[in-house]
């Protein structure tokens, strides 16, 4: 939607760096942003761009929340029970040297991360409104297996984020994509480029 190259050079993404992403060539800047929804020009289909900053914060093992050393290590299991008793410790720590998992430390970190995330979203929307005079949209979408599977504490994180928005930042509305389009119908139509998911098709 914005143009350019949102991924950068070839790099590994995903909660545990298990997905290689090969970016497409750079495209000229479009003048559009991901703070709005848009119609496609040839169909009554609305599109929203995932906010890179907000999404990367939750998805990235390298720079986001899931890679924190106190969170439970996914790859090391006890040989007999199959249970996970260890924490990530650090990205470079060998599996055999992982420290034992402490659920209290992990829960404290979830509280810290959810505080940071709700504040981040609030300031992103507030800064956008100050700059443009318009209400903005921050769209985030994730594979559901991220929460509770790859990132064991992810379910609690989502729970706390929703609770904190409801309690402390009720002015930040949470809604589904369909609810947003219904209450804020797009005003512009854009042509989106083909990607590996839409190539040769019509995106709907």
Located regions from the model:
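A conserved hydrophobic secondary-structure block that centers on an alpha-helix together
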Residues: 1-6
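Active-site and substrate-binding clefts of carbohydrate-active enzymes
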Residues: 27-204
